[in-house]
Design a protein with these regions (language model features):
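Short, surface-exposed ligand-recognition loops at beta-strand->loop->(often short) alpha-helix junctions
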Residues: 10-13, 80
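Conserved beta-strand-loop-alpha-helix junction that forms the acyl-donor binding cleft
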Residues: 12-14, 106-107
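Major-groove DNA-recognition helix of helix-turn-helix-type DNA-binding domains
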Residues: 26
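Conserved active-site tyrosine of GNAT-family acetyltransferases
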Residues: 18-23, 91, 119
Length: 140
């Protein structure tokens, strides 16, 4: 298997609410390849998909069982501590739940966490040790 992921799919409890959060709230552009029940958001090398959670579980032949923590977090790497603060303020206004307010962290950066409308955990972090290229991709 090549060292590459192309798509991250988040299961949603309320598909339209989730699409509105990302599309209208955050201003992300939905791909024209999106279809009923599947919203696709190109993120520069990887695509975020939204799909009803129950249907996603059924497709994997699993029974959907809610949990507080799935073991998965998504991360947005900000360019400054101020951007971390600004993003967390923005998503709170959009109805996201702030789980951990922005703060200095043990690894030398600055980060906070929020849950989107379906409870997916998203970190907003500034890491002074990591650089971003001209397309905002991590240089590792």
């Amino acid at each position: 298997m090549r060292q590459k992921l192309n798509l991250i799919t988040l299961g949603t409890d309320n598909f339209e609410r989730s699409v509105n959060f990302y599309e209208k709230g955050l201003g992300w552009k939905r791909s024209s390849e999106s279809v009923d029940g599947l919203a696709l958001f190109p993120l520069g090398g990887i695509t975020l998909a939204l799909h009803p959670r129950q249907e996603l579980a059924e497709d994997a032949t699993l029974q959907y069982k809610p949990t507080e923590f799935s073991g998965l977090t998504l991360s947005y790497n900000a360019k400054s501590e101020k951007e971390v603060d600004d993003v967390l303020k923005e998503v709170k206004v959009l109805g996201a739940v702030i789980i951990k307010p922005a703060q200095k962290v043990f690894w030398g950066g600055y980060s906070g966490y929020f849950k989107d409308p379906d409870g997916h955990l998203i970190e907003v972090a500034y890491n002074p040790f990591w650089k971003l290229d001209e397309n905002d991709n991590l240089i590792l």
